[in-house]
């Protein structure tokens, strides 16, 4: 009879074997493999951020049936909403939009501007506006496999991530995790993908308007959440038993 420890060990071995296979493939091959292996239980996410067009183009070309989830926090830049509309029209798809259960106006009226309340406030804001909607998306779409466009070059906290990993009950994979900024730029140029409007305004990363500021590539991690942290919470274990992430 398998113990809980045996089960966890088996999961780690499965992920290790999957990573070994994924390492031998390019980004397109990784997406095709995952789409076939986990058909019917896989989703992808997009933030419609600065480099989102890359993953969206790869998905449209190599796995167009994978649902694309967009978490609308209610606090994105106006330019991001317009860019989202442009990319969906250009690439010919419609994202599945998930929003918080509470409106931005109600949240602020009852709890204030939580993102100004230090790490605890930012974490609670992320749980309500990002983690809960994403968890709901996974549950409603029947998915336990999640594709994301994270890259090691984006931050020190992402530099050691593998192509695939377990996050709570969800298997996550990052098909372009090993792409550097130059490769991203070449791909966008070669495929004539439109750039986010704020890329020319000095932004090197993109999130909510209240917690993202312009900056240089060398200071990318200080441009989010007043430099107190980089991850919004979606790519960290929620630590809650009723969450998939």
Model-identified regions with their sequence ranges:
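Nucleotide-activated chemistry modules centered on ATP-dependent adenylation/adenylyltransferase
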Residues: 2-245
């Amino acid at each position: 009879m398998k113990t809980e420890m045996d089960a966890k060990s088996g999961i780690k071995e499965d992920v290790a074997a999957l990573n070994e296979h994924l390492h031998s493939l390019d980004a397109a091959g990784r997406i095709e493999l995952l789409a076939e292996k986990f058909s019917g239980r896989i989703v992808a996410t997009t933030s419609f951020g600065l480099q989102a067009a890359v993953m969206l183009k790869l998905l449209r070309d190599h796995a167009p049936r994978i649902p694309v989830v967009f978490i609308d926090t209610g606090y994105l830049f106006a330019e991001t909403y317009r860019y989202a509309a442009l990319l969906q029209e250009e690439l010919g798809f419609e994202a599945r939009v998930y929003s918080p259960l509470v409106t931005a106006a109600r949240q602020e009226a009852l709890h204030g501007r939580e993102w100004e309340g230090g790490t605890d406030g930012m974490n609670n804001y992320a749980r309500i506006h990002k983690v809960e909607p994403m968890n709901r998306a996974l549950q409603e779409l029947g998915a336990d496999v999640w594709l994301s466009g994270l890259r090691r070059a984006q931050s020190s906290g992402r530099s050691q991530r593998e192509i695939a990993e377990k996050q709570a009950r969800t298997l996550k994979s990052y098909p372009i995790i090993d792409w550097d900024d130059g490769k991203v730029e070449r791909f966008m140029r070669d495929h004539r993908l439109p750039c986010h409007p704020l890329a020319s305004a000095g932004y090197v990363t993109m999130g909510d308007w209240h917690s993202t500021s312009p900056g240089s590539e060398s200071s990318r991690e200080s441009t989010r959440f007043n430099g107190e942290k980089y991850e919004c919470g979606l790519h960290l274990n929620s630590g809650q038993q009723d969450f998939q992430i």
